């Protein structure tokens, strides 16, 4: 209900919204959660496992219960926290994890079955009959699991990634954060002030405090106005710092479009920031924890500090008759504020015997809440008084405060561990856990406003001095300095179910059961019970759960330890992390210099990594790609063909130790390679498996040009960087990728030399440019590189020119080729040509094959060392038991061979234990007039001439094949060298 005269909302601006199909009204400045409470909507959702009724618990990002699905036109955003969603006119939200309705949820039957669904039930309950797991149990569990549902529609909203640099990043804009920002801003530092809420001020907006004689909210307004006037201060509201990383890098999620339905064109819904800073101050405050008692999860039971936030910031009371239960002095502030606002406070239950009231309300000292009543919302509580008597109190809202936990999460993101502070009964940040990050205010365990202001100023001054700024501290504002008093109290005890993790339905009993079943480690307990594995990551429950675990194991909380803190601090949309990573342009589209002309000729383009390459070049009268492919293959075999091979990786290598570097990378020697010659090379990973193959030309005494496959160009470049920096930093060598510097074209076929001699400034011959040779040439006065290498098995060359001349050269080559009866050929024909010749691609060197497997073991030099050499000789990586490269020809009635199909002995049953290999590549060869294939077959080189059965289980195709050598065309190589 609304409370007159309270809150920072604008009651003159009425906003309409819907929840669960019902229409409601709120005010500007409301959150969705506060507006729902103002409309007496206490039932907001259902829990994950038992589907128990759930209401709002907190007022921040740690909210475990009030998760809703927001709808914006066709867009749907599940698992949105109502506590963090500013209200806007037309907002549409609906509850989730309930069917058919929120009030009547069929799966609430799980709560009746709770004895069978206790901790670790999935390891024990559904074990029999065994085959039911796959067909019955697992599908049923997966169907029931989850909270919100993703939309299956394409997300048309814009997301961005961005980078920012600053002197100091201040995380959180409460009293410590604002004071730190003012101090750093006045000192002239470049400041970023990030806060996850839409309004700055932190807890100051939720308290009835005064700073320097003015209301805290007014002081916040003045501080923010001053900060906004600094050119060196950037204020980022609605921005959650999600992770701390090496070298002063922080991740942050800015929810740009959080408070509007439709964004202006070009404005992103969310932006994920990478912030680089010289220093950071964590002022993220503290999170209130619960006390476990029977049925403490009913709607209407919430954090006492959150109740205070809804009253003082939003002008909302979650009930008409309010009770408070706590173990610390801060809980009394809630009772005081509600009483002063005219809301009936029926009880302040304090577990401490010596507690003193702060106002006019009934106080029960040395008492505890033992249970609650109500089906879909709280109706009453039972308390046990200090004399042992039990009393029932009617109320519709209960605020619970088990103390405050400093927000240590970011300080632990680099494997640091927090430090237990017995005075606070909480974990506090470990100093120096994150280099350059310090904590101030409640995040550092300083719970008073005066202390938070002082720490924020002190840490900012220290950082300013470290960065060379001379600054005099300004007068510190005067604020409340009341010390924080607490007597630890975690669990009331009793026979009823007392809840710790509200979202995942983890109870005190579950923790104790995990201990009984010997899951005593905190990490084991976490995974066995799912404690702290919900979307709030245990922010509300982990410390209380650790206390229960410590008690059950007879240890202290410090000895029990904490689970590992990992980023992100709050859930981050994958669309924000991968901004720009969806749709066709998720990565750079790399186009050939011949792209325009290829498309003009009707060539369908296919993706080859990030490149677009022509698949084939159709001609008039051709109705199927095979017709074009067969024609192009025969064209290359009989006349001449032109193919753009610019996509091959090209790495320029120079330096006195270039040859030694290549010898270390490749299995074979390149120090012995003569200038003007090209050599085929094989590169291994450190585990002995083939990484890549390609050619390397020696352009000068200390100058080489390496080519890689299109698929592995980036991988090879990264590998070379690693080898040079990590393994051989002693070598004086430099290398750089020049893939896009050069346009390179294969000229293949019997007429290849004739074509080139028609365009080169000086003619070539077999003597001046033999097979596997290189020559610097000119055509029309333009310097070019000519390599005599072949991937087709034909007399062939590769001609490279600076990329700016690529399109013109392609046009020239194409015209000359067509005049000789040839033309362009695409990727399909290139694949057929290489299979006919027995050449391999990454279909064969797919990461699981060795030099021995592909028949190139002799290329591993005995005279030198190289990466992977020793590992490649391990038992199991050589020998007849290995799958070895072979060729296949169909010899039965069925002529179909399918890549990926498995090979079996002709009479063997086609099951896994009889598997003898698999097909990697196949094509129809117009040269041979039949289907041919490459495959890996166990001991294949000794089985040429034998028969093998190919079985493709998905399509049900079985083909009898003859095993042969992988080289089908011109095995002597006469056409290459002619």
Description of each model-found segment:
Residues 1-589, 741:
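Residues forming the flavin
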Residues 544, 552-684, 689-691:
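Acidic, proline/glycine-enriched N-terminal capping motif
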Residues 286, 519, 630-646, 690-703, ...:
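Residues forming anionic-ligand binding surfaces in small-molecule and nucleic-acid pockets
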Residues 595, 599-600, 613, 700-703, ...:
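Conserved, structured C-terminal
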């Amino acid at each position: 209900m609304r409370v007159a005269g309270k809150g920072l909302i604008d009651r003159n601006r009425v906003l309409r919204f819907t929840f669960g199909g019902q229409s409601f009204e709120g005010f500007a400045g409301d959150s969705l959660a506060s507006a729902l409470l103002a409309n007496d909507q206490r039932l907001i959702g259902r829990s994950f496992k038992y589907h128990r009724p759930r209401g709002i618990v907190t007022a921040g990002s740690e909210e475990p219960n009030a998760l809703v699905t927001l709808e914006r036109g066709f867009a749907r955003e599940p698992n949105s926290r109502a506590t963090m969603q500013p209200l806007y006119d037309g907002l549409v939200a609906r509850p989730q994890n309930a069917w058919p309705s929120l009030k009547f949820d069929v799966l609430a039957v799980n709560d009746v079955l709770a004895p069978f669904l206790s901790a670790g039930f999935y390891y024990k309950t559904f074990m029999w009959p065994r085959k039911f797991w796959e067909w019955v149990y697992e599908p049923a569990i997966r169907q029931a699991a989850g909270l919100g549902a993703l939309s299956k529609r394409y997300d048309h909203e814009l997301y961005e990634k961005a980078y920012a640099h600053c002197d100091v990043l201040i995380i959180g804009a409460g009293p410590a954060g604002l004071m730190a920002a003012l101090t750093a801003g006045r000192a002239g530092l470049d400041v970023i002030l990030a806060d996850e809420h839409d309004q700055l001020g932190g807890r100051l907006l939720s308290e009835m405090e005064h700073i320097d004689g003015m209301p805290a909210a007014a002081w916040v307004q003045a501080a923010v106005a001053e900060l906004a006037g600094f050119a060196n201060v950037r204020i980022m509201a609605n921005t959650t710092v999600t992770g701390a990383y090496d070298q002063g890098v922080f991740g942050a999620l800015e929810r740009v479009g959080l408070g509007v339905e439709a964004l202006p064109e070009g404005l992103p819904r969310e932006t994920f920031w990478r912030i680089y800073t010289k220093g950071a101050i964590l002022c993220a405050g503290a999170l209130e924890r619960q006390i476990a008692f029977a049925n403490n999860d009913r709607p209407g039971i919430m954090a006492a500090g959150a109740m205070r936030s809804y009253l003082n910031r939003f002008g909302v009371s979650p009930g008409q008759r309010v009770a408070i239960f706590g173990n610390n002095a801060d809980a009394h502030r809630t009772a005081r504020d509600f009483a002063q606002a005219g809301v009936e406070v029926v009880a302040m239950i304090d577990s401490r015997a010596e507690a003193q009231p702060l106002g006019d309300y009934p106080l029960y000292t040395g008492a505890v809440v033992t249970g609650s009543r109500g089906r879909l919302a709280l109706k009453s509580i039972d308390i046990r008084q200090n004399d042992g008597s039990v009393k029932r109190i009617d109320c519709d809202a209960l605020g619970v405060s088990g103390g405050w936990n400093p927000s240590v999460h970011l300080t632990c993101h680099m494997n640091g561990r927090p430090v237990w502070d017995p005075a606070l009964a909480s974990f506090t940040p470990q100093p120096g856990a994150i280099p350059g990050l310090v904590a101030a205010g409640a995040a550092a365990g300083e719970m008073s406003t005066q202390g938070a202001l002082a720490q924020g100023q002190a840490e900012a001054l220290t950082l300013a001095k470290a960065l060379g700024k001379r600054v005099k501290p300004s007068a510190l504002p005067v604020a409340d300095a009341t010390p924080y008093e607490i007597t630890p109290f975690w669990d009331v005890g009793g026979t009823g179910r007392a809840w710790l993790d509200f979202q995942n339905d983890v109870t005190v009993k579950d923790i104790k059961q995990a201990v009984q079943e010997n899951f005593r480690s905190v990490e084991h307990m976490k995974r066995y019970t799912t404690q702290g594995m919900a979307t709030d990551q245990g922010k509300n429950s982990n410390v209380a759960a650790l206390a229960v675990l410590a008690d059950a194991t007879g240890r202290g909380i410090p000895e029990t330890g904490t689970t590992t803190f990992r980023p992100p601090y709050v859930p981050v949309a994958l669309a924000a992390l991968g901004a720009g990573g969806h749709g066709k342009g998720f990565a750079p589209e790399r186009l050939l210099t011949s792209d325009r002309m290829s498309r003009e000729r009707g060539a369908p383009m296919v993706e080859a990594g990030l490149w677009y390459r022509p698949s084939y070049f159709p001609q008039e009268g051709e109705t199927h790609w095979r017709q074009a492919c067969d024609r192009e293959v025969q064209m290359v075999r009989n006349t001449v063909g032109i193919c753009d091979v610019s996509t091959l990786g090209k790495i320029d290598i120079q330096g006195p130790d270039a040859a030694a570097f290549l010898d270390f990378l490749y299995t074979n020697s390149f120090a012995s390679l003569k200038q003007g010659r090209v050599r085929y090379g094989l590169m291994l990973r450190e585990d002995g498996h083939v990484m890549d193959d390609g050619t390397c030309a020696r352009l000068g005494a200390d100058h080489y040009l390496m080519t890689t496959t299109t698929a592995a160009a980036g991988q090879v470049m990264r590998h070379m960087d690693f080898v040079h920096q990590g393994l051989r930093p002693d070598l004086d060598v430099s290398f750089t990728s020049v893939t896009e510097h050069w346009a390179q074209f294969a000229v293949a076929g019997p007429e290849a030399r004739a074509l080139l001699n028609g365009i080169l400034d000086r003619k070539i011959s077999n003597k001046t440019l033999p097979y596997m040779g290189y020559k610097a040439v000119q055509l029309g006065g333009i310097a070019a590189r000519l390599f005599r290498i072949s991937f087709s098995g034909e007399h062939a060359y590769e001609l490279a020119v600076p990329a700016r001349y690529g399109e013109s050269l392609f046009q020239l080559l194409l015209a000359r080729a067509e005049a000789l009866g040839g033309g362009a050929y695409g990727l399909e024909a290139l694949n057929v040509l290489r299979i006919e010749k027995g050449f391999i691609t990454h279909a064969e060197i797919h990461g699981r094959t060795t030099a021995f497997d592909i028949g190139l073991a002799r290329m591993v030099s005995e005279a030198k060392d190289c990466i992977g050499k020793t590992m490649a000789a391990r038992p199991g990586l050589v020998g007849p038991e290995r799958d070895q490269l072979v060729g296949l020809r169909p010899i039965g009635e069925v002529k179909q061979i399918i890549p990926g199909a498995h090979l079996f002995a002709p009479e063997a049953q086609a099951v896994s234990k009889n598997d003898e290999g698999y097909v990697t590549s196949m094509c129809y060869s117009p040269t041979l007039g039949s289907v041919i294939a490459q495959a890996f077959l166990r001991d294949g080189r000794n089985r040429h001439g034998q028969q093998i059965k190919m079985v493709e289980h998905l399509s049900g195709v079985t083909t009898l094949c003859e095993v042969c050598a992988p080289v089908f065309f011109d095995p002597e190589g006469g056409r290459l060298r002619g």
